[in-house]
């Protein structure tokens, strides 16, 4: 991995780590669908301005439909799921569950896209799941139905991420490539189109008790413009440069940022379970991302 790609990966980890902090502020006030919709729609508006200022030519090269569908899978659905999780999980929890993305990517790649699977990777997957299990007892939240709902929401979101990474490589990169800024815009457009009718129905039937104060809307701007618009430009650039599995290793670093942001700015407590679970996931990801040559291939 080149130094530039590594720098982008670190920037993306820092930015996405902060997103869990913002959602923890926003989601309990606005609710699930408003949080998800405002996140992607603000990101979409921000990308429109960025592309206009940079005078980027709007040439999707016949890939607009693919970008829209990717946006639904990679942004719209996960944004909703993480908004659900943010109402019941501390920011650090969501960030650490998000670290299972490469594990999901390995499984999906082997089962659906004929990516090589090794015994080493299988060991990493089970070790990672064990680490996530330890995390369910971390911090101030007792294990109950709400915690389980939040955890399953995060894991469903990471499954979407893993699936979308391979689709992006097949639909975009392997067919001539596409400017990462256009990929990000198309993705946000797709997510916005998916969530718009759901948001409208939600507001009409169950409007939020409060639309929040300045802190909520400043957090929304940060979530939409920095943690989504800017982040997805970086993400699609990394997908093109290093591939979906290596790009997904950004989630290896996100938990550290997520836990630190939560402890520093939201006064969320830290425990040894955070450390043990995070270390297990770190070892699991190292096993999963080792070159296939060091392990014995297993047919999926």
Language model feature labels by segment:
Residues 4-8, 34-49, 69, 124-130, ...:
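Hydrophobic alpha-helical transmembrane segments of multi-pass integral membrane proteins
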